[in-house]
Structure formats: C-alpha cells, structure tokens
Swiss-Prot record:
The gene is purA. Homodimer. HAMAP family: Adenylosucc_synth. It comes from Bordetella petrii (strain ATCC BAA-461 / DSM 12804 / CCUG 43448). This is Adenylosuccinate synthetase. Its cofactor is Mg(2+). The lineage of its organism: Bacteria, Pseudomonadati, Pseudomonadota, Betaproteobacteria, Burkholderiales.
C-alpha cells in the first residue's frame, strides 16, 4: 500500500492529469503542486460541470483536503487571486485550505512583457510559449535575482530588488527586443495592493508537509505539463522551463525523495502536442482531424488547437525510465472508438538504424521516422465503462500491447471525463 503518490504526464502535456488527481484526492489529506505556473490548465468534470484549474491543485474540489503550492512553482499573484475568486464564486472554500510556499518566485508584469516580446521577435522560429511570463520568471530564479513571495511583505527589500531587476529587463526590452519599458512604480503598486490578500495563505510548506507525513497522512503530488516537455529531458529547445519529472516533486515541494512511494504516469491512448517541436507519430490527415474533433483537443488555458497522432510507445518508454513509473493510467480510450485499425509507435528509424526509445533533442527527434505496428480497432463504444472485462476485446488487446511496449502495467483506464468513468485494475493508494 502506497502512502504518497506522484502524478506525472508522460507525453507533451494535456494527458488528463486533472481528472485523475481529482479522483485520487478522495483518498488523501494533501495535494501539492511542485512545478510550472499558470501556463497549464487542469480540466475537471464533476457531475457534468466543467472546472479549469491553472495554479490551484485539483484537490481543492474536496472539502477535507489541504492544497499546497510548492516552491518549485512560479507564482503570478494576479492569476492566483483571480482563480481563487472564480472558485469562491462557485461556492468553494479556498483560502482556509490553500498554503503557498514563501519561497515561490513571483511572476510580475516585466516577465510577461519579455516573454511576449521574445516570441514576437522570433516569428516562425518561436518556441510556442503561452506568453504568461513563465520562462523569464524561471530565468530570474536561476540567475539568483528573483523576487519571491516573502519579499511582498518587506517593501524596502522589494523596492531594492525590483530596481535592479528592471535595470536589466528594461534594457533587454528596449535595446534588444524593441519593446516599451515597464514602469517600476506600476509593478510595485500592483504587487503591494495584492500582498494583503495573499499573506494569510503564505506558509513554510516544506515543514507543514513534513508534519503531515509524521502524522501518517497521505499526500498527492500533482505534476503539470509532461515529461517530454521537461527542460532537461524533453525535446529541447521545444520544452517548458521547469523539470516536469517525478523527481522534481522532491525539490519543488521540499520533501525528501524517500517520501515518493508510487509514480502514476498519465498517458493518452493517442498522442497530442501543442505549439512547435518535432512529433514523430503526428497525423496530418483526416484521422488526425478526427482525433482532434472527437477528443476536443484544444488547450484549456490558451484555446490553441493540439496536434494529434498515433500513440508513441517509444516516447512513453523514455518517460517510464525517467520517472520510475510504477503504473500507467490510460486516458481518452473512447476517442479511438470506431476506427477500423489503429497504429501504435514501437520505435524509430534513425539513419537506417532501429531505436526503441525517443532520442534526445529536437534535431535528433526530427530525424526519427516512426516505426508503426497496426492493430485491429473496435466498433463498440467504450464510453463510461467501469469494468475491464466489459471493454471490447480489441480495446483490451490494444491496452495490453501498450503495456508490453513500455514495460509497465496499466493500473487505471479513463473512459470519459467524469471522475466516475474510470476502470480500476490496481488502485495507486489502496493496492
């Protein structure tokens, strides 16, 4: 029996992590975000009602669960408070159940200005960021110049650090990117106006998570984006600016790695990608359009259409190794309903040689030709099925082949957007 579970996306994000975290949150006392910012949305459907969370952990939907934003998250005070207000308007108690690490780096207006100006300057060569300032905020963190949440409550120190930051960022904006400068007074006034609303939620998250573990309580660590977008191990440079792997939960929440008992890898039954970057199994035909239409493949935060393709087992194998995945959850199986045949990526041809795992770096991946294996499809609907034996035989064979290719068992299968539309083969927290 596992006490603490890490939920990770194994592809290029958008795998359906939010629903699964929400479902698992019924069995834990705390849910922790440990990386990313408000650039990724987790979509939940509860009794037919749609909720999109960007910063706040998906456990907020459960009254008895405490939610944490760990130090690995870059925090926009404005985006946070807007999301809190939206949830409160829907009748949820948020502020008494949300704790924010005092050492989270802040996202401020100059980060957004730099992010958007850079993308505009690159034109067709752009990375495809969301333009929300995530990357520049992480840059400040690594350069050891970031303003952090705790600085909001020390105005003199805030002003001192802000002056130095804007000397640098305004030089880049005006002299290199050809964009307007950002006003220090406006940044300061906005931040100081928001600080009192945030103050009661600011805590020593690491210590509080330690105390919960000492009391025998269970924790769920909620990853954002996906392993193939990891800044180190993803299709660099077409990646996000943080580490999206299971190991990042330790550093990004302030807990010891021995606290991570089980890693659940969330995997779509096909593959999607948003924005630029190589995609070996991409479909640019009517089947790709069908997957996008039936799967409603549009970003929950940006609204951008997602590129669609066949399931890539060799890419999943890379994710399995990087994350030490214990078990898989396959989502959106129902999107494949009605296809006469289905193809599954088992490797690549690279310079005439077969490779059974995704290469490193965007250039190498772009040179890789997917090796596909054809399996029979199924005509029956899988929507809402909650027992594995009731799935069509061809759907079961497809899932079994996925597990064979990546070498990890499938513990959960999602057959619809609602939390109850789930097949449980092995419960991550109950065995």
């Amino acid at each position: 029996m596992s006490k603490n579970v890490v939920v990770i996306g194994t592809q290029w994000g958008d795998e359906g992590k939010g629903k699964i975290v929400d479902w698992l949150a019924e069995s834990v006392q705390g849910v922790v975000r440990f990386q990313g910012g408000h650039n990724a949305g987790h979509t939940l459907w509860i009794n037919g009602k749609k909720t999109i969370l960007r910063l706040i952990p998906s456990g907020i939907m459960h009254p008895g669960v405490t939610c944490f934003i760990g130090n690995g998250v870059v925090l926009s005070p404005e985006a946070l408070l807007k999301e809190i207000e939206e949830l409160e308007a829907a009748g949820l108690d948020v502020r008494s159940r949300l704790q924010i690490s005092e050492i989270c780096p802040l996202i401020l207006p100059y980060h957004i200005a730099v992010d958007q100006a850079r993308e505009a300057r690159k034109g067709e060569g752009k990375i495809g960021t969301t333009g929300r300032g995530i990357g520049p905020a992480y840059e400040d963190k690594i350069a050891r110049r970031a303003l952090r949440v705790q600085d909001l409550f020390n105005p003199a120190l805030f002003d001192e650090k802000l002056a130095e930051l804007l000397d640098y960022h305004n030089f880049v904006l005006t002299q290199y990117l050809g964009a307007p400068a950002v006003s220090a007074a406006q940044v300061r006034d906005q931040a100081m106006a928001l600080a009192p609303a945030i103050a009661p939620m600011v805590k020593d998250v690491s210590s509080n998570l330690y105390a919960m573990q000492q009391a025998g309580q269970r924790l769920l660590f909620e990853g954002a984006q996906g392993a193939l977008l990891d800044v180190d191990h993803g299709t660099y440079p077409f990646v996000t600016s943080s580490n999206c792997l299971a190991g990042a939960a330790s550093a990004g929440a302030g807990v010891g790695p021995q606290s991570l008992d089980y890693v659940l890898g969330i995997t779509k039954a096909y593959t999607t990608r948003v924005g630029s970057g190589p995609f070996p199994t991409e479909l640019v035909d009517e089947i790709g359009t069908r997957l996008a239409t039936i799967g409603k493949e549009f970003g929950s935060v940006t609204g951008r259409p997602r590129r669609c393709g066949w399931f890539d087992g060799a890419a999943l194998k890379r994710s399995v190794r990087l994350n030490g995945i214990t078990g898989l959850c396959i989502t959106k199986l129902d999107v494949l309903d009605g296809l006469e045949s289905i193809q599954l990526g088992v490797g690549y041809r690279v310079n005439g040689e077969f490779r059974d795992v995704l290469p490193y770096g965007a250039h190498a991946v772009a040179q890789a030709e997917a090796v596909l294996e054809e399996l029979p499809g199924w005509s029956e609907s899988t929507v809402g099925i909650t027992e594995y034996a009731k799935l069509p035989a061809a759907a079961r064979r497809y899932l079994e082949r996925v597990a064979e290719v990546c070498g990890v068992p499938i513990d959960l299968v999602s057959t619809g957007p609602d939390r109850n539309e789930t097949i449980v083969l092995r419960h991550p927290l109950k065995g």
